Amino acid sequence: MPNIDLPTLEAFVHAIPQNYKGPGGAVAVVRNGEIVLRHAWGFADLAARKAMTPETRMPICSVSKQFTCAVLLDCIGEPEMLDSALAAYLDQFEDGRPAVRDLCNNQSGLRDYWALTVLCGAAPEGIFLPDQAQNLLRRLKTTHFAPGTHYSYCNGNFRILADLIEQHTGRSLADLLAERIFAPAAMKTAELIPDTALFNECTGYEGDTVRGFLPAINRIHWLGDAGICASLDDMIAWEQFIDRTRHDENGLYRRLSSPQTFADGAPAPYGFGLKFEETGGKRLTGHGGALRGWRCQRWHCADERISTIVMFNFEGNASDAALKMMNAALGIPPAKPVRAQANPGWFGSWLNPETGLVLSLEDAGGGRMKARFGTGPEKMDISGENEAQSSMTTLRRDGDMIHLARKDENLHLAMHRLKGEARQDIAGRYRSDELEADLLLVSEGGAIYGAFEGFLGKSDMYPLYAAGPDVWLLPVQRSMDAPSPGEWKLVFHRDAAGRITGVTVGCWLARGVEYKRL
């Protein structure tokens, strides 16, 4: 490729504080192992007036997952080495237990444990300890799809990996990371700090320019799925290590970033803690990270030996910034989608009865729709009267049915339009035997509210909103991890006499949790 258009790239970077508003951040571009751009702005702590620098450490959150998998490959070998240990760990399973490779590739079908903490009554700013993580993970008996058939993001996969690695080696993950990864990569200040409450070198902020920025409170203990704190310079060193070892057939990053498939042979979007993407015909590998008050993203294009890194101490869209930086470095112009006028027949709520997942669509203007299906809303371009797509999802409408496809997830669902009014007779207490947790629904002044209760406590009351007959939505916008699970979908079941017998509770991260009415 031709040389990077440095003025264009610099112009984008210097506009980041205006386009991604928040207290501070740090970004870098690396090509051929050399630093093209290294920039920090704003403040690491607004109250202390402590400036952000390339040496400022921040939590890299889920970017840690690739490093957990790197330790696995470097210290133990192929994932199959730990399959028997995983069978002992998930000893409550009757059948359909995932393999360790499924964990590495987010194909396990296990429900995300941070999402399940909500159902177990956790407070967003509560304390979450290692024994509580194992308590939750080791009680699991089912998956929400057959392992190896689909992709679903699951932090618990990597928490379990960390436990298995420590058990197998007899050493802490912190020591293994320091010795086998950080030292060879010259990541001089990178460190595993599992307890988020202990990190105080930089402050992460909730909020925005409308509500203001407030210091985020985090008191969770995580391991394997996240927990590494690193500076921009540490992350630059990682990219340089990747470039130095690119010709090594057994190089760590080459092994981490190798293509993966589903059980049916279809290409998978994820492997060994890395997300696979494409831009302008170029393959990218990388990962994002999030915790309340923090966002980060790294991308690497092996074909052109280019990497981009974005780290924010606020909840800005680091993934968007990192991809746009990559496109600028690659000389890829912004896409100009052709949009059609929205047909009102799109708008409303649509249910897939098999998974209990609900798709909600509303007009966003300018030939776009706002869709709610996964962890957060996504904007969809309407490309024809009955077709719409985003970077993740394709929709094809046929009357009162929408065919939803998420190719990367190997997921194809028939979504049926919800018509009619919801009955109000859902109040009561419901029990999940697998989670040993309750859902309490009450009616106050004609409005329905719900709360979760379990071994982690009793949650606040959340309002429910009707989506259609016997289908309700319960939004949860703050949880222990970030982003939050979003809308929980509640699909109620009735007997032949019309009495409520139970409810299926789920979201994209944790589908199909069955509750019976008490």
UniProtKB/Swiss-Prot annotation:
Region (Disordered): 373-392
Active site as annotated: S62 (nucleophile), K65 (proton donor/acceptor)
Chain segments carrying region Important for specificity: 477-487
BP-aspect Gene Ontology terms: proteolysis
EC identifiers of the protein: 3.4.11.19
EC class name: hydrolase
The name this protein goes by in its record: D-aminopeptidase
